[in-house]
């Protein structure tokens, strides 16, 4: 288990990293009008300069950010590979009814992908969606509901159950409980049914549509302690997909005992030298077909330096 000093160091490193992040100069800005309600959605993008079609990275902003405000993004890493990149606003900060993985959010992101396919030289066999925190939440939502054929999804620090997260946020006395009510409340009161309607954990899994798509779920083991989203959200969603996909091998699931160990001790016992994710130890990993859960030494974060190196395959 990490000491208080070590956890504090991780938190400080995150603050320094976020503070030093800058929006790349090469990003351009455009806008799209929603077919649902005429809303104007801002998008940031960068096109490949290659002579042949290249992959498309669709990055989704976090809960408290918009495409205008979020600074830490994978645009630099995408630019280094000369791939296409798009960063849509999809209703901005999650504090109003049309945000928070509403039908408007799903449609906005799908329309941003439409824009990219029309205006960029995209290899349509290699479209990737990535997001952290609220962006991880939106990434899971797109796995479940996007009309596009997406090759791979990379979800980090994800919310999967808005109803559970409301209760967790109330207990922690943070700002998110009030924002959840702003998204799904009825008469300014929390509405459990509406919360579940916005939760990928309760949605029907498109097993057939996603049979050739990869889903990589990443979560730092300290999230929920030093971060705002308990790792149970990622674990429960992973297990749900296996159940919906009728995975028969019980060893592929995260057992209750394993989940309890991870949640209560923020570690997992092993006699082997752990594999790494970038420079972080992988504490626990489960895989079923094209779906993988990775619990790593970290907190509520995305490791930008490894996202694109891992997004194309399970290895």
Model regions: which residues?
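Bacterial Sec-dependent N-terminal signal peptides
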Residues: 1-22
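A domain-start/cap signature at the N-terminus of enzymes
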Residues: 19-54, 132-134, 172, 183, ...
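Short substrate-entry loop that stabilizes the transition state in hydrolases
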Residues: 51-54, 59-98, 162, 225-227
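Mobile cap/lid helix-loop segments that gate and shape the active-site cleft of serine hydrolases
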Residues: 64, 69, 152, 158, ...
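Primarily recognizes the serine-hydrolase "nucleophile elbow" in alpha/beta-hydrolase
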Residues: 65, 70, 117-119, 124-172
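Alpha/beta-hydrolase active-site loop
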Residues: 100-120
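C-terminal catalytic histidine-bearing segment of alpha/beta-hydrolase fold enzymes
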Residues: 216-218, 224-225, 231-315
